[in-house]
């Protein structure tokens, strides 16, 4: 090989090396850009995943809040119904307590009346009908007359007016009812 050929070969090698260096530089720039884009994408993905987790946590928290609110509303509705029911029962009991003396007085009037007297018969019938109407109206509202006569005395339910000994009754037995109760 001649000198000239060597120079041409050397020059070709130099050009080839320069082209490779240039390709490597271009490849490196592309790699850098690609890596930067990949890093940006990874950062964006991480950011979106964090936002998703935060959103899911918020949704779960709001679902829990909704469930608690529903439970609270249900509890409030139940408590309100119970309070209304109690108030209704209390009002009914108070009303019945006020009617009991009227019913007792009508019963006393019936017992005291002379059923044989023709002059008293129409009046007695009116009192009996009034008594029956009162008892029917009170029973419509679920109240029943309690007559403990002949039953054992219960201090939770009965009020003793007097104590008497009787050979016909056992000890601690209600012998006579002065004022009836309703339940």
Swiss-Prot record:
State what protein this is by name: Protein GrpE
Its taxonomic placement starts with: Bacteria, Pseudomonadati, Pseudomonadota, Gammaproteobacteria, Vibrionales
Looking at the Swiss-Prot or TrEMBL record, what is one Pfam family this protein matches? GrpE
- State the source organism's domain of life: Bacteria
What does this protein do, in the record's words? Participates actively in the response to hyperosmotic and heat shock by preventing the aggregation of stress-denatured proteins, in association with DnaK and GrpE. It is the nucleotide exchange factor for DnaK and may function as a thermosensor. Unfolded proteins bind initially to DnaJ; upon interaction with the DnaJ-bound protein, DnaK hydrolyzes its bound ATP, resulting in the formation of a stable complex. GrpE releases ADP from DnaK; ATP binding to DnaK triggers the release of the substrate protein, thus completing the reaction cycle.
Q: Which compartment or compartments is the protein found in? A: Cytoplasm
Keyword annotations from UniProtKB, A to Z: Chaperone, Cytoplasm, Stress response
Subunit info?
Homodimer.
Similarity field: Belongs to the GrpE family.
InterPro entries per UniProt: GrpE, GrpE_coiled_coil, GrpE_head
Q: Where is this region: Disordered?
A: 1-20
Q: Which GO terms describe its molecular function?
A: adenyl-nucleotide exchange factor activity; protein homodimerization activity; protein-folding chaperone binding; unfolded protein binding
Organism, per UniProt?
Answer: Vibrio vulnificus (strain CMCP6)
User: What PANTHER family has UniProt attached to this entry?
Assistant: GRPE PROTEIN, GRPE PROTEIN HOMOLOG, MITOCHONDRIAL
């Amino acid at each position: 090989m001649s000198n000239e050929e060597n120079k041409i070969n050397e020059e070709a090698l130099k050009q080839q090396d320069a082209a490779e260096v240039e390709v490597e530089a271009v490849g490196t720039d592309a790699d850098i850009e690609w890596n930067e884009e990949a890093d940006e994408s990874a950062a964006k993905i991480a950011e979106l995943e964090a936002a998703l987790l935060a959103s899911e946590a918020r949704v779960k928290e709001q679902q829990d809040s909704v469930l608690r609110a529903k439970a609270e509303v249900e509890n409030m509705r139940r408590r309100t119904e119970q309070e209304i029911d109690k108030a209704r029962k209390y009002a009914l009991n108070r009303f019945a307590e006020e009617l009991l003396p009227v019913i007792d007085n009508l019963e006393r009037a019936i017992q005291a009346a002379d059923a044989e007297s023709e002059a008293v018969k129409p009046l007695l019938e009116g009192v009996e009908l009034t008594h029956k109407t009162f008892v029917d109206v009170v029973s419509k509202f679920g109240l029943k007359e309690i007559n403990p006569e002949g039953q054992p005395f219960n201090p939770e339910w009965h009020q003793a007016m007097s104590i008497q000994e009787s050979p016909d009754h056992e000890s601690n037995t209600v012998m006579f009812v002065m004022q009836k109760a309703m339940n």
